[in-house]
A protein has these predicted regions:
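Acidic/histidine-rich helix-loop elements
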Residues: 22-23
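Surface-exposed beta-loop-beta
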Residues: 157-170
Length: 170
């Protein structure tokens, strides 16, 4: 996938992260004398590679394995758990699934994947949606999920970022 993006900022460019991701807390607001003109970015970083395996085991069950990655990560201070939980190239999903168990990294259990909007261009999620991929151990049955996930908290502007010593229980 190849992207060509032209941006014109009326209130200043704001945070460099905005050129790759939609993060509302980093958008420049208010009057600014910064007339930087337009910016053009072209890349193929949203191209994805996915490998899915389905291995039969005794009893008619199977073990499913998924490995998916892309290159959609910004270099520098932003290639961290807040954005991708990985580094260049960016690992999106890497998990094994057997019966009701899932072990690895995929969409957080706290996220409603069905609420994601259809979009040709990945700009992130709409405001108010929990969005993230976490390392986890998850058990699912009859519409109920129980998971132990990577503990990562980011609350912008109040200094409440934290890495806990115990996993998130969802």
């Amino acid at each position: 996938k190849v992207d060509g993006i032209y941006s014109d900022y009326s209130n200043g460019e704001g945070h460099p992260l905005n050129r790759d991701f939609y993060v509302p807390s980093t958008i420049a607001v208010g009057a600014s004398d910064d007339d930087i003109g337009g910016r053009f970015d072209g890349h193929a970083r949203q191209s994805r590679f996915r490998l899915t395996t389905n291995t039969p085991v005794d009893g008619g069950d199977s073990i499913t394995g998924v490995l998916e990655f892309d290159f959609m990560v910004t270099k520098g201070d932003y290639d961290n758990e807040r954005i991708s939980n990985s580094y260049l190239p960016r690992m999106r999903h890497a998990f094994l699934k057997y019966k009701n168990w899932l072990v690895g990294q995929t969409w957080t259990t706290f996220m409603d994947v069905g609420a994601l909007h259809e979009s040709l261009d990945f700009i992130g999620t709409t405001d108010g949606i929990t969005f993230g991929r976490q390392v986890m151990v998850r058990y699912s049955q009859n519409g109920f999920d129980f998971a132990l996930e990577n503990p990562e908290t980011t609350v912008v502007g109040v200094g409440a970022t934290d890495d806990n010593s115990v996993p998130d229980v969802i």
